[in-house]
Amino acid sequence: MTHTPTLTDDQLAEAQETAAELRNLARDILSDAAGEAPDTVERPLDPAVWAALEETGLARLTGLEAAGGSDAGWLEAAAVLGEAAAAGTPLPLLEHDLLAGWLRDTAGLPGLPPSGDGPVLATAAEVVAAGRAVTVPWAAAAASVVVLDVSGAAPQVYEVAVADLEVHERVAVGGEPQAAVTLPTAVAGAVTVSQEVADEFRHRGALGRAVQIAAAAEAITQLCVDHVTTRVQFGRPIGKFQAVQQLVTDVASETALARTMVDRAVLTVARHGLQDPTAQFAVAAAKACAGASAEVIVRNAHQIHGAIGTTLEHGLQRRTRPVLGWRREFGTTADWEDRLEELVVTGDADLWDLITR
């Protein structure tokens, strides 16, 4: 099992500087690739964008250097993940790097040989019961699925080629491809891992989704501000009306709350690793908070924009639709609120330390 060491203040400062540089690099790649608005709700993987991310090392930031990664941490990964979410560009960064790649590195899997000329993309999924179909994000674009199988006596990890699976494709709320797949269990060559690895997988997914929600929320807030200052009704900008001001204020305040909780969680995980109780508490709080804030942000943003915000040409729905999907993935808001209660009631850590550390 991999272990994330505690970072010193100097290492943390260096990681933050690197994260800022990577954020700018990701922004340049995404802005260069920005073209005409899509004319369909479906948002398949842009091969040119993904190729640019692979070429610059952003597609596999946290991977081990020996396996072709950059050996980066959560601060750097969150910067790139958030930039893509803010741009409204669907990319499997969480699935490919922070989940599938991490599972493969942790279990010591060699990886499957590449097939064809397409991107060597992996996605991840968790099997909780044998024979039950699970949702696999980006299955149509991926070459393989790295599976965490918790249906047996002990968690196991294995990798299977998508070509060997029966895949029922569909479209996620945000427009990105996903599929319903019945994954095999008790696979020959599967590697047994600890329960801590299974727990970390879920916390990784939750933190990644919280990062995406917070970043998209900031972009949504800016769209709202731009709209109310330029849209004129009854001879003045609609931002002059008190009811509209209240809607915008609620969007901005919920966004700030989500951003604060997510930043704290990322920083805590970067310092202490996801096996630390304080880090787990911070992740649970971030996902619960981001999920709760998402409801207010999406509702108010569409009230502010009116019908124009739902059109395919407008950037609002390209950010609000993914947020609605992300808030339910890797645990709902209620699930993580229950997890917070569990950590407080049954955990060894002091509540004050969990909140203030």
Residue ranges and their predicted role:
Residues V136, A190-T192, E218:
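Short helix/loop capping segments that flank catalytic or ligand/cofactor-binding pockets
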Residues L99-L103, A141, P177, I213-A216, ...:
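Internal, well-ordered alpha-helical segments in soluble enzyme and binding-protein domains
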Residues S151, D164, T185-V187, I213, ...:
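A broadly conserved detector of short glycine/acidic/proline-rich loop/turn motifs that flank catalytic sites
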Residues S31-E169:
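Glycine-rich flavin
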Residues L148-S151, V171, L183-T185, V211, ...:
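Short, structured patches in soluble enzyme cores that scaffold and shape functional sites
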Residues M1-A85, H203, L207-R357:
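Alpha-helical interface subdomain recognition
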Residues V157-E159, T192-S194, A210:
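A short secondary-structure junction signal
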Residues G174-R204:
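A short, charged helix-loop
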